[in-house]
Amino acid sequence: MRKTLNYVIMAGFQSPITIAQAIERIHRNEYLLPAFQRDFVWSAEQIEKLFDSLMKGYPISSMLFWKVKGGTKTDFRFYKFLSAFIQYHRICNDPIPTDNINDFYAVLDGQQRLTSLYIGLCGSYAYKDYRKRWDYSEYNFPTRHLYFNISRKYTQEESDREFIFSFVDKNISKENDLFIDKSNEKWFRVGKILALHQDYNYGIDEFAEDNNIDKESKRLLRLLDNVIHTKLNINFYEEDEQKPDKAVNIFIRINSGGTALSFSDILMSIAIANCKQMDAKTEIKNLVEHVRSKGFNISHDFILKSFLYLYHKDVRSLITSFNLGFIELVENNWTRIRDAVSNLFDLLRSFGLTDFTMTSYNAAMPILYYLYHLSLIHISEPTRPLYIS
């Protein structure tokens, strides 16, 4: 049995690829992010350290991709990679219609690293300048691009890093491929390495000659080129079963460190991401707090289960249940659902029930179903016996 299990696990590992190949696949929307992925949270310093580690030859831990094909592509919402990050103001990814695109990979593990590489090579990172205001403007949150100091390295006394990468304000760099700072040190825009590699008529040698780059600096450029275009730095495991629940369970397992994710958290993320008209996160949060104010300590898990109980033939919490069509149905009937849930707990409280005496909130689901589908929304004390007659 153990040999068989090992074979199944190993069968999913694919041939490693270069960083440049991964970037190209992101460009072509072959790598996308599922709705349950978290927002990008890495700092500029973390991205700089990632590039330093790559230059030192340190490996990137393996990633996990889910091959999405067929009907699964349109059952859920997927997102593009973030390229222009703005601290606090632009941290969310843009959704992408997937009905007319080829099969693609959804990144289950590796989002932060791949996004960091993408921003470093093709995008920008803006964060608030010291003592500036928090409202967004280019002045307060200047756009920065990743640059590589090719004039020197860090000393051991300066930093635990060796290679100097830094996000430089575009007002300083003028967005040039190479700029010289006040200390007469040369900074190379990291994303330029992609163009130099692809242009057969104008590569590193020609660039170095035009910019008076010395031998040691050119060696650093070649090392960067090798890291991006030659070394097979991206190792990944492919999951190709069209079972969203399995993909989510894998995602939960690999993200179990730190703040634990539950299956309910994932369903909540999918519900929020797939709502088109209402702010589902705020609406559900407000409803939960409203019910808690009545003395019943429910969570968003109860609200999600109520969606299934009211509308779905299968009341199990499955990813496949929370597809776009189902979420649209919930969204269109949200006001009635909200009122039914609120009045359910008014009714339970009028019966003398409390959070302490409710052994399971699942027991209240049939009552919710009855109230909702018979449109018995507004409950008052004089009419209470009508519900139990």
Which stretches of residues belong to each language-model region?
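Short alpha-helix boundary/capping motifs
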Residues: M1, M278-D279, W334
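Basic- and aromatic-enriched surface patches that contact anionic nucleotides/nucleic acids
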Residues: N6-A44, E48-H312, D355-F356
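Single conserved hydrophobic/aromatic residue that forms the stacking wall/gate
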Residues: I377-S389
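Short amphipathic alpha-helical segments with coiled-coil-like heptad repeat character
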Residues: G258-A260, S375, Y387
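Structured, charged N-terminal subsegments at the starts of enzyme catalytic cores
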Residues: Y309-L374
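N-terminal amphipathic/basic-hydrophobic helices that include classical n-h-c signal peptides
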Residues: M1-I9, L386
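Extended hydrophobic/Leu-rich segments
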Residues: M1-T4, L82, I164, L368, ...
